[in-house]
Design a protein with these regions (language model features):
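Single conserved hydrophobic/aromatic residue that forms the stacking wall/gate
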Residues: 1-10
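Short beta-strand/loop segments at the ligand-binding rim of alpha/beta enzyme cores
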Residues: 7, 65-82, 144-154
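Active-site beta-loop-alpha junctions enriched in small/polar residues
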Residues: 7, 37-39, 77-81, 105-109, ...
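Active-site glycine- and acidic-residue-rich loops that bind
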Residues: 12-19, 45-52, 75-96
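Generic structural signal for well-ordered alpha-helices
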Residues: 18-26, 50-61, 87, 91-92, ...
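Conserved, mostly hydrophobic/aromatic
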Residues: 34-35, 77, 102, 142, ...
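Glycine/Thr-rich beta-alpha phosphate-binding loop at enzyme active sites
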Residues: 39-52, 92-150
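Catalytic cores of alpha/beta
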Residues: 82-96, 144-148, 158-170
Length: 170
């Protein structure tokens, strides 16, 4: 079994769960996000692997397209804890499937050396200012990997107008 939205709830087929969610919610949504990046959900980040991601994206796009006249844009949200091969694989899957956009990034499992106090030893996703540099670098790498052909939304650690502008420039 794979675990889905919390460590207390497991599913034997995460892709089927996403498809059910898309089918039910698409007629009501302005846009939808396929989050494959929660560090707090065991096994979820495995859906970022190229083969699994392509399978998932094909399935949710088909579900969205079958949900009636309303076809909200579908975006996929990815983790910041990716190497260049993973970024390339995700970009390739996103472009090949025709997903509408990518959100970079969710929270990180990394703990920067500058982090102090209890947060330094906490498990789970780290957000806020410590995420800004990593998330912005990953956003820039996705822009290069997609040759600017895929709409990107940069999130993570934005605390000011200057931070927002840095994401735009990334």
């Amino acid at each position: 079994k794979e675990c889905d939205w919390s460590s207390d709830v497991c599913s034997s087929d995460l892709i089927a769960d996403y498809v059910k969610g898309i089918a039910v919610l698409a007629p009501l949504a302005q846009y939808m996000v396929v989050n494959v990046s929660s560090p707090n959900t065991p096994g979820l980040r495995d859906l970022q692997r190229k083969d699994r991601l392509a399978e998932l994206l094909h399935a949710v796009i088909a579900a969205r397209n079958s949900a009636g006249e309303r076809r909200p844009p579908l975006l996929v949200k990815v983790a910041p804890d990716l190497d260049s091969t993973q970024i390339s694989d995700i970009a390739e899957a996103a472009l090949a499937t025709g997903i509408d956009g990518l959100i970079a990034t969710n929270t990180t499992i990394e703990r920067p050396s500058s982090l102090q106090g209890v947060a330094k030893g906490e498990a789970g996703g780290l957000s806020g200012k410590p995420l800004f540099g990593l998330a912005t670098r990953i956003l820039s790498e996705f822009y290069k990997a997609t040759s600017g052909k895929l709409p990107l939304i940069g999130v993570g650690g934005i605390l000011s107008g200057a931070d927002a502008y840095a994401k735009i420039k990334a």
